Amino acid sequence: MYDNLKSLGITNPDDIDRYSLRQEANNDILKIYFRKDKGEFFAKSVKFKYPRQRKTIVADNSGQGYKEINEISPNLRYVIDELDKICQQEQVEVDLKRKILDDLRHLESVVSHKITEIEADLEKLTKNR
């Protein structure tokens, strides 16, 4: 699993926190950030440079002109797919945690209101005696 990341020397893909991708001249720069350990001020990161792939394509439908374009390297595309799986999985976990906390707060509110209602009913019973 995560063979492309492992080929970059990343032995523990689960330690990845996030990544950034930018274009610089004819290169794509991938920066991978890892989770901070306790006591660290900055997250550890590694940077990789991928040359953009050059392609010559037909410029218009008449077939008379050609133009050269640059696009992302196929290897980088595979690495990004793996990074997206890791980072999106963490986002799903964060969303689930937030949902559970929201549900818990709602339950707390409902129970609190119900307790107040029951106490009021008890108060009515004791006043009628």
Curated annotation (Swiss-Prot):
Any matching Pfam family: DUF3461
Protein family (similarity comment): Belongs to the UPF0325 family.
NCBIfam families: PRK13677.1
Lineage start: Bacteria, Pseudomonadati, Pseudomonadota, Gammaproteobacteria, Enterobacterales
Organism encoding this protein: Pectobacterium atrosepticum (strain SCRI 1043 / ATCC BAA-672) (Erwinia carotovora subsp. atroseptica)
Top-rank taxon: Bacteria
The name this protein goes by in its record: UPF0325 protein ECA1027
